Amino acid sequence: AAYTASKHGLLGLTRSTAFLYGPQGVRTNAVAPGPVATGIEAPMLSPLAAGRVGPLLQVVGLQVAQPEQLAAAIVWLLSDESSNVNGAVLPSDGGWSVV
């Protein structure tokens, strides 16, 4: 519950900051990543969790992102190409948020 509450707190902070500082030209956005292949999760993944996630990956076709894919979303948000984006939460999760 604490993890979920903290994530939603960051969403609110992103939007509030965008509202407050947007008039001064400050853009505030967030990226909501799904699983990323960093290797950090491997020691924490229990056999039970692996048994639940593995079949989901195969049936739904979801993938674990490479760090470069997540970085590309962040680079886009920092670029002039996203100059009209403010207060957004960009999912970079390969479809995990719709499952």
Where are these regions (language model features)?
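Cytosolic ligand/metal-binding cores
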Residues: A1
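Active-site helix of classical SDR
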Residues: S6, T14
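Short, small/polar-rich loop/turn modules that mediate ligand/substrate recognition or access, typified
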Residues: G22, R27, V85-G87
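A glycine/serine/threonine-rich, flexible loop-to-helix segment
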Residues: P23, P35-V60
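Conserved SDR Rossmann-fold cofactor-binding beta-strand/turn motif
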Residues: R27-A37, L78, P91-D93
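C-terminal substrate-recognition "lid" of short-chain dehydrogenase/reductases
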Residues: V64-S92, S97-V98
